[in-house]
């Protein structure tokens, strides 16, 4: 039996940053934990980013992942929203880097394809499949489901060296 590899998935957002932790042992995936980071909306932008940074850093310290998968920013019709989302993503990635966690980035389409089988799946389809792939996960918010999907995608795509934190 192989040594379990712990993977943290992050679905970044300024209002809701989803997170999920899984362990991979061979082809088997096991749910460890999931949740959503909700920075208070009355904080300034810098304070919200700091909140995300601190919370993701604490998750990395508590769960000690070997690797992390972070969803890439989808550039949409609103460049201002994409920029703000990118800042939240940067705060999460910086926290992971500070904790010494290897980070891989995945496009939303790649995550959906990896979990659902189609890159055009909607959030409810992703959540449905995450709950099927990780039956012990129980009920979850969509942001947490997206983060777990990112962790599952990372489990499928990361090279073994990165999963183990090797240089």
UniProtKB/Swiss-Prot annotation:
Co-factor requirement: Mg(2+)
Q: Which PROSITE patterns match?
A: RUVC
Give the record's cofactor note, including how many are bound. Binds 2 Mg(2+) ion per subunit.
Pfam families to which the protein is assigned, alphabetical: RuvC (PF02075)
Localization terms from the record:
Cytoplasm
- Is Oxidoreductase among the key words of this record? no
Q: Which GO terms describe its biological process?
A: DNA recombination; DNA repair
Q: What class of enzyme is it?
A: hydrolase
Q: Which GO terms describe its molecular function?
A: crossover junction DNA endonuclease activity; DNA binding; magnesium ion binding
Q: Which GO terms describe its cellular component?
A: cytoplasm; Holliday junction resolvase complex
Its Enzyme Commission number(s) read: 3.1.21.10
TM segment ranges? none
Give residues annotated as binding Mg(2+) 2: 71
Query: Which positions are annotated as binding Mg(2+) 1?
Result: 11, 143
Q: Which UniProt keywords apply?
A: Cytoplasm, DNA damage, DNA recombination, DNA repair, DNA-binding, Endonuclease, Hydrolase, Magnesium, Metal-binding, Nuclease
| Catalytic reaction annotation | Endonucleolytic cleavage at a junction such as a reciprocal single-stranded crossover between two homologous DNA duplexes (Holliday junction)
Main subcellular localization, coarse class? cytoplasm
In the UniProt entry, which residues are flagged as the active site?
A: 11, 71, 143
Family per UniProt?
Belongs to the RuvC family.
Q: What does this protein do?
A: The RuvA-RuvB-RuvC complex processes Holliday junction (HJ) DNA during genetic recombination and DNA repair. Endonuclease that resolves HJ intermediates. Cleaves cruciform DNA by making single-stranded nicks across the HJ at symmetrical positions within the homologous arms, yielding a 5'-phosphate and a 3'-hydroxyl group; requires a central core of homology in the junction. The consensus cleavage sequence is 5'-(A/T)TT(C/G)-3'. Cleavage occurs on the 3'-side of the TT dinucleotide at the point of strand exchange.
Q: How the protein assembles, per its UniProt entry? A: Homodimer which binds Holliday junction (HJ) DNA. The HJ becomes 2-fold symmetrical on binding to RuvC with unstacked arms; it has a different conformation from HJ DNA in complex with RuvA. In the full resolvosome a probable DNA-RuvA(4)-RuvB(12)-RuvC(2) complex forms which resolves the HJ.
Could you tell me what this protein is called? Answer: Crossover junction endodeoxyribonuclease RuvC
Species per Swiss-Prot/TrEMBL record: Hyphomonas neptunium (strain ATCC 15444)
Gene name per UniProt: ruvC
């Amino acid at each position: 039996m192989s040594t379990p590899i712990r993977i943290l998935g992050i679905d970044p957002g300024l209002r809701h940053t989803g997170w999920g932790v899984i362990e991979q042992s061979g082809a088997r995936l096991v749910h460890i934990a999931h949740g959503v980071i909700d920075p208070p909306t009355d904080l300034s932008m810098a304070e919200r980013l700091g909140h995300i940074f601190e919370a993701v850093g604490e998750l990395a310290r508590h769960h000690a992942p070997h690797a992390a998968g972070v969803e890439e920013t989808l550039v949409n019709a609103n460049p201002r929203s994409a920029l703000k989302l990118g800042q939240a993503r940067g705060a999460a990635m910086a926290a992971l880097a500070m904790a010494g966690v290897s980070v891989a980035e995945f496009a939303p389409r790649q995550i959906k394809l990896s979990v659902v089988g189609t890159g055009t799946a909607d959030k409810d389809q992703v959540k449905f499949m995450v709950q099927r792939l990780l039956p012990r996960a129980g009920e979850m918010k969509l942001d947490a489901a997206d983060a777990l999907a990112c962790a599952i995608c990372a489990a499928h795509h990361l090279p073994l060296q990165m999963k183990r934190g090797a240089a």
